């Protein structure tokens, strides 16, 4: 990664997103966090918070345009927002809609404006956070499992159909990670062999970026 890279992270208020932001601020990059709340108590001229809702295409489009206007480009975009609802086939329609909006449509909205930018720049890296549940399953959450499978399918299609483009795409599929989302779930089946620390996940992400791996398996 270049020393003056512009990095954007959605879902940056905690967990993996916050660890990504912290890591790249330490490297001196310009980092923009997109989320509903700002949890960073830092005074760093390279950090910028933009309030936005990843479920809204209008919000995403306006924020990315704002970033381009201010910074001139985007080098790395981490599409990282996520939620977790416990439930089976009886999960409410609103839970299903929320999970699909956050875990699938947010990436769709971002890709619509980001990919043309990357093609114009002739470079860029689109990193999408999915989950090991998207490769296997999450015993306690049907909505999470199904929509994370959709996340991976989306990333695969984008990668295959842009194979000869000048930008890269990766999908991140970690096992259980110690975040606010998994707090109190240390005894869940997914965490029986322990939870990963967010910083460890970022280590694996950096290795994969260097090697240009599509599937990142922390």
What are these regions (language model features)?
Residues 136, 157-167:
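Active-site-adjacent segment of SDR/Rossmann-fold oxidoreductases
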Residues 83-97, 140-143:
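Conserved mid-core segment of classical short-chain dehydrogenase/reductases
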Residues 13-14:
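Conserved glycine-rich cofactor-binding loop
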Residues 111, 147:
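Active-site helix of classical SDR
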Residues 131:
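Residue(s) in the substrate-gating loop at a strand-loop-helix junction
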Residues 171, 187-218:
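C-terminal helical subdomain
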Residues 51-62, 93:
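The beta1-alpha1 cofactor-binding region of Rossmann-like NAD(H)/NADP(H)-dependent oxidoreductases
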């Amino acid at each position: 990664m270049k020393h003056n890279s512009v990095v954007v992270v959605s879902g940056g208020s905690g967990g993996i997103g916050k660890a990504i932001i912290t890591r790249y601020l330490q490297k001196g990059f310009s980092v923009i966090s997109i989320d509903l709340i700002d949890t960073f108590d830092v005074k760093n001229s390279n950090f910028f918070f933009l309030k936005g809702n990843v479920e809204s295409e209008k919000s995403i489009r306006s924020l990315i345009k704002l970033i381009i206007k201010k910074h001139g480009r985007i080098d790395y975009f981490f599409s990282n927002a996520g939620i977790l609802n416990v439930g089976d086939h009886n999960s409410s329609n609103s839970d299903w809609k929320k999970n699909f909006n956050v875990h699938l449509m947010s990436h769709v909205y971002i890709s619509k404006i980001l990919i043309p930018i990357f093609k114009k720049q002739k470079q860029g890296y689109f990193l999408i956070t999915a989950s090991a549940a998207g490769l296997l399953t999450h015993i306690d959450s049907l909505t999470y499992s199904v929509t994370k499978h959709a996340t991976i399918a989306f990333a695969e299609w984008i990668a295959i159909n842009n194979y000869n483009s000048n930008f890269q795409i990766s999908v991140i599929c970690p096992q259980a990670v110690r975040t606010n989302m998994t707090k109190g779930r240390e005894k869940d089946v997914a965490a029986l062999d322990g939870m990963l620390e967010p910083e460890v996940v970022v280590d694996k992400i950096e290795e994969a970026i260097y090697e240009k791996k599509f599937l990142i398996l922390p």
